[in-house]
Design a protein with these regions (language model features):
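Short connector loops at helix/strand junctions that flank enzyme active sites
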Residues: 43-45, 65-69, 75-77, 97, ...
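Short alpha-helix capping/helix-loop boundary micro-motifs
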Residues: 68, 104-109
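Conserved short histidine dyad/triad with adjacent acidic residue
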Residues: 48-66, 76-90
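A short hydrophobic beta-strand segment most commonly corresponding to one strand
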Residues: 119-121, 137-150
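A short, N-terminal "cap"/entry segment at the start of jelly-roll beta-barrel domains
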Residues: 2-49, 57-60, 65
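Short, conserved beta-strand element in jelly-roll/cupin
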Residues: 68-80, 88, 95-100, 146-147
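Conserved metal-binding segment of the jelly-roll/cupin
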Residues: 113-132
Length: 150
């Protein structure tokens, strides 16, 4: 897992061409004007999902992990807590669904506040819980870039 500000994205170019393309998209796109939906960047290798939602209490969140895609989660506006734990010590809540590339878990995690202009990268070995309210519920607009691992 990596959490940082977009202005430091150049530090992560060595993570591969697809991650680099993801950061280029974040820097070159007027993100505030993007409507919720799916945006193709490089076919099914790299695509973006824009969503707007209200953050929720931790009790309503689920730890999740993906096998085929890395998540580059960028907060366009608002702020949220993102939970994280290394994959391995959790109990499976819902088994892996290949069609959605998602598996749900329960277990220990730690939280970090991610605000507008910040990103989090979650790799397949990172269990994460996004969208959690840092206190009371608030509105968030977020772009998640899905980066194929192979």
């Amino acid at each position: 897992m990596i959490i940082d500000k977009l202005e430091n994205a150049h530090l992560y170019k060595n993570l591969g061409e697809r991650i680099s393309k993801s950061f280029d998209y974040l820097k070159q796109t007027n993100l505030k004007n993007l409507a919720p939906g799916k945006y193709e960047i490089d076919g099914e290798n790299i695509f973006a999902l824009v969503s707007e939602y209200k953050t929720k209490p931790e009790s309503e969140g689920k730890l999740e992990a993906h096998k085929k895609y890395i998540d580059v989660q960028y907060v366009i506006s608002g702020e949220e807590l993102m939970g994280y734990s290394p994959l391995g010590n959790q109990q499976i809540l819902e088994p892996y669904k290949e069609e959605n590339d998602i598996e749900f878990f329960e277990g220990d995690k730690s939280f970090t506040k991610v605000s507008a202009g910040m990103f989090a990268i979650f790799f397949p070995e990172d269990v994460h819980m996004p969208g959690i309210a840092p206190g009371k519920s608030s509105s968030v607009k977020k772009l998640v870039i899905k980066v194929r691992t192979n």
